[in-house]
Amino acid sequence: MSVSAFNRRWAAVILEALTRHGVRHICIAPGSRSTPLTLAAAENSAFIHHTHFDERGLGHLALGLAKVSKQPVAVIVTSGTAVANLYPALIEAGLTGEKLILLTADRPPELIDCGSNQAIRQPGMFASHPTHSISLPRPTQDIPARWLVSTIDHALGTLHAGGVHINCPFAEPLYGEMDDTGISWQQRLGDWWQDDKPWLREAPRRESEKQRDWFFWRQKRGVVVAGRMSAEEGKKVALWAQTLGWPLIGDVLSQTGQPLPCADLWLGNAKATSELQQAQIVVQLGSSLTGKRLLQWQASCEPEEYWIVDDIEGRLDPAHHRGRRLIANIADWLELHPAEKRQPWCVEIPRLAEQAMQAVIARRDAFGEAQLAHRISDYLPEQGQLFVGNSLVVRLIDALSQLPAGYPVYSNRGASGIDGLLSTAAGVQRASGKPTLAIVGDLSALYDLNALALLRQVSAPLVLIVVNNNGGQIFSLLPTPKSERERFYLMPQNVHFEHAAAMFELKYHRPQNWQELETTLVDAWRTPTTTVIEMVVNDTDGAQTLQQLLAQVSHL
């Protein structure tokens, strides 16, 4: 009996089972112990293969692929700390709902806890973060193939969101020519190999439940809060709120067109919050709210009912309002809860939103990161998409810009880390094939610098704008101790990215004014390559501009 041959047949069943659940993209890191999984993936024509040498970046690449494809994405890594590097992407997926299938190769049990090289305790290492965890036994013909395939089917068939960790121990030898070992074991699955459906089909019913008193509540004074949702949902939500005559407070990830722009500015005005206090119901569609003033208002508002509608399960209200947590697809929920044409009840807020936007426009000429955030809608590629980083940049765009309704916007706003942002953007571009504008800060770019290797392979123009404000300037907005702020919070690195781009043979530009930036963008959108644009700005100007605008708008 050939151990290596049966390892591969065992792995082939696992990989084929994944295809029955919509897995098309598979991300593979180099490794020896994962050889059976890697070769099985390579031999399966249903997969689109992606490779990367950095497992942390690989996990985020898979995350980006899953964001756009809306399908589960598989990841293959070898044993040891390679597995641990998938943790950040798994955590993010659990919070934002992407489906990741982590296939982690492992040493067999007799090599664990005995000093064997690259052998750690992998089963259960991700604690409660995976939706399902499977610790497979060592491949053996004593276990029928139908057990293996139905085990995979059960985990994936009941997966609504988040990650599945499948730990796969393999004994040596891992290499060798294929022989007849295990053919009869494999063939007991019969015509499943020619089919395209799971061996075990589980279809948990998830239907949106109609709120029978909706016809009562839609006649009341309401507010719509729009969090993270799809582009199509964003357009529908905007129309729904407009028909109801309810003010729509749209997050940067809502894709609603933010009909009341600069919400994080005007929510600092007492006239706005006073008017919002008249709301009898708040309907929040989507989670992951960004703006500080929005979160403060959300925490302090006290309507009679607070409803949160999101496809993700679990509690999504840190303010613990009295109301309803409705687990539903947003588009389906809107269809079940039609709007009734009513006149807008808010008078003050539309005026404040317009004045706030005019205050931002009055400052748009200076060459800075706050101004870039405001102008970002002018720089979006046609039929493209936007990927927004975390920390200060996403807050500036949320507060100062007005993105087009239905224009796709992606970000990692679950755990909101700055790790893996470039890798995620690479996955977003690969899955969509669309022109992509990505914008991150300098520390975020440094954190994921390895991912520039992924940006060498794009199918459409990708522009990466690195806003270099020399450190974590978001801490300038927080009451950090001034004497220790630079050393322990901002951590300026005093670096530029020209040589990083050159190392990966990416085009690089460092514009000095808006005209140079716009000329660079026009050229960049013409060719299916990556262009790195480093925008060097004064350290604290972005944070100071935001603070000045907040003060100005609060006194309107």
Swiss-Prot record:
Its EC number is 2.2.1.9. Its cofactor is Mg(2+); Mn(2+); thiamine diphosphate. Binds 1 thiamine pyrophosphate per subunit. One of its GO terms (molecular function) is 2-succinyl-5-enolpyruvyl-6-hydroxy-3-cyclohexene-1-carboxylic-acid synthase activity. The keyword Magnesium applies. CDD domains: TPP_PYR_MenD (cd07037), TPP_SHCHC_synthase (cd02009). GO terms for biological process: menaquinone biosynthetic process. It holds the Pfam family TPP_enzyme_M_2. It comes from the Bacteria. It catalyses: isochorismate + 2-oxoglutarate + H(+) = 5-enolpyruvoyl-6-hydroxy-2-succinyl-cyclohex-3-ene-1-carboxylate + CO2. Pathway: Quinol/quinone metabolism; 1,4-dihydroxy-2-naphthoate biosynthesis; 1,4-dihydroxy-2-naphthoate from chorismate: step 2/7; Quinol/quinone metabolism; menaquinone biosynthesis. Keywords: Magnesium, Manganese, Menaquinone biosynthesis, Metal-binding, Thiamine pyrophosphate, Transferase. Belongs to the TPP enzyme family. MenD subfamily. Catalyzes the thiamine diphosphate-dependent decarboxylation of 2-oxoglutarate and the subsequent addition of the resulting succinic semialdehyde-thiamine pyrophosphate anion to isochorismate to yield 2-succinyl-5-enolpyruvyl-6-hydroxy-3-cyclohexene-1-carboxylate (SEPHCHC). Homodimer. NCBIfam families: menD. This is 2-succinyl-5-enolpyruvyl-6-hydroxy-3-cyclohexene-1-carboxylate synthase. It comes from Escherichia coli O6:K15:H31 (strain 536 / UPEC).
